[in-house]
Swiss-Prot record:
UniProt keyword list: Hydrolase
Signal peptide residues on this chain, from the entry's feature table: none
The UniProt record lists the keyword Hydrolase: yes
Protein name: Deoxyguanosinetriphosphate triphosphohydrolase-like protein
Entry-linked InterPro entries: dGTPase, dGTPase-like, dNTPase_2, HD/PDEase_dom, HD_domain, PHydrolase_assoc_dom
Length: 405
């Protein structure tokens, strides 16, 4: 049966000239036949959702340890929220929604158990062997560590999806070849030897909307979780003019609203205003740049999808509030110290005795290795753990496991 692509409900004429074209991608590292019913970016998104790494996000920390309660966000719920915002932005700007969604869904694959605390601890123990970077780890997962296909390791994503993943925070190199944020992690350089991701250019606009969607979701939902936990109060939110304005708006319309509904009304307005701000900035910058292709977006001298100066200042104020009231809260700091101890202890135990990893694959690959490659394998194993698995593994090996409640 022949499929008429022109009659399918995607990839139509509404896509902007500067959008990524799902039918003429820059390919995959391992060539594959195309699908008659799905674009390459749809296939990327579907492959991402079916990975083990995606399922593990369910039990990885966003801010609060995954065992704290059913209503707090995990990496998985955060990822889904980012994907929803990215897709909305992509539709508004006439981009390829599947590419934007796929980049959003894969962006946190490399995160360790216990959030940034786990990443910092793993980076510390891996410093003698090159350190740890969650973006580079995400790339390793989708190009090497996921083992699902007969003909290759990884999930063989398109160049555009990998570019969006690697350039989540913008170009990694200056035009002169210097690192924009320090040395480029070696796994990224190694992959670029095989499939050059052009680290000195900006990513597609689809990848840019996925990145700014991450910021929008972080700020909004960390406030929501902070209020739920009691670490934040409405009075604290009043310190930020933008949030104070939203609260006044909600109170004026709903003067007797219960706290949970009041919170939701603030959050939905915050997301809406931030999304509209990004769309407005992108439209303005596109009107100046007048790009005629996705290549013109990459060659631009600045990011297109971003906050206005006023919203960027609000973003800084919100991050400062979250850092002060939540991330540096004494209770959270105690939990973070315990989480770091778990990661450090497990790394030392597995380096000393790889059989304690209780995985034939990892043990077989480590046998006889020198310390540097052994440490990288142990790091991969630890980074893939969920919060709950790391805690149970520590309890099996040690007499005392820190209380993370």
């Amino acid at each position: 049966m022949t499929v008429d692509r022109r009659a399918l409900g995607f990839g139509g004429s509404e896509r902007a000239v500067y959008a990524a074209d799902p039918w003429t991608t820059r390919g995959r590292l391992y060539p594959e036949d195309g699908s008659p019913t799905r674009s390459d970016f749809q296939r990327d998104r579907d492959r991402i959702v079916h990975t083990t790494a995606f399922r593990r996000l369910k039990h990885k920390t966003q801010v609060f340890i995954a065992q704290d309660g059913d209503h707090y966000r995990t990496r998985l719920t955060h990822t889904i929220e980012v994907a929803q915002i990215a897709r909305a932005l992509a539709r508004a700007l006439k981009l390829d929604e599947d590419l934007a969604e796929g980049v959003a869904l894969v962006h946190d694959f490399g995160h360790t158990p216990f959030g940034h605390t786990g990443e910092d601890a793993l980076h510390e123990v891996l410093l003698p062997y090159g350190g740890f970077d969650h973006n580079a780890q995400s790339l390793r997962i989708v190009t090497k560590l996921e083992r699902r296909y007969a003909e290759f390791d990884g999930i063989n994503l398109t160049w555009e999806s990998l570019e969006g993943l690697v350039k989540h925070n913008g170009p990694l190199l200056t035009p002169e070849g210097a690192g924009t944020r320090g040395p480029v992690p070696q796994p990224i350089l190694d992959y670029c030897e095989l499939h050059d991701l052009e680290l000195a250019t900006y990513a597609s606009l689809e990848a840019q909307v996925a990145a700014i969607a991450d910021d929008i979701a972080y700020n909004t939902h960390d406030i929501d979780d902070g209020l739920r936990s009691g670490y934040l109060t409405f009075d604290m939110l009043e310190e930020i003019p933008f949030l104070a304005g939203l609260m006044a708006e909600v109170r004026a319309r709903y003067p007797h609203l219960e706290p949970s509904r009041f919170t939701h009304e603030i959050m939905r307005r915050q997301i809406t205003r931030m999304v509209e701000d990004v769309i407005g900035v992108a439209q303005q910058r596109l009107s100046i740049l007048r790009p005629e292709s996705a290549a013109d977006i990459r060659a631009a001298d600045r990011v297109i999808a971003t906050f206005s100066d006023a919203m960027a200042e609000t973003d800084r104020q919100i991050k400062a509030l979250l850092f002060k009231r939540i991330y540096r809260n004494p209770d959270i700091m105690r939990i973070r110290a315990g989480a770091a101890q778990i990661v450090t202890d497990l790394f030392a135990a597995y380096m000393a005795s790889p059989k304690e990893m209780q995985s034939h694959y990892w043990v077989d690959h480590i046998a006889g290795l020198a310390d540097a490659p052994k440490a990288r394998h142990v790091g991969d194993y630890l980074a893939g753990m969920t919060d709950t698995y790391a805690i149970s593994a520590h309890r099996r090996l040690f007499d005392h496991t820190p209380d993370l409640r």
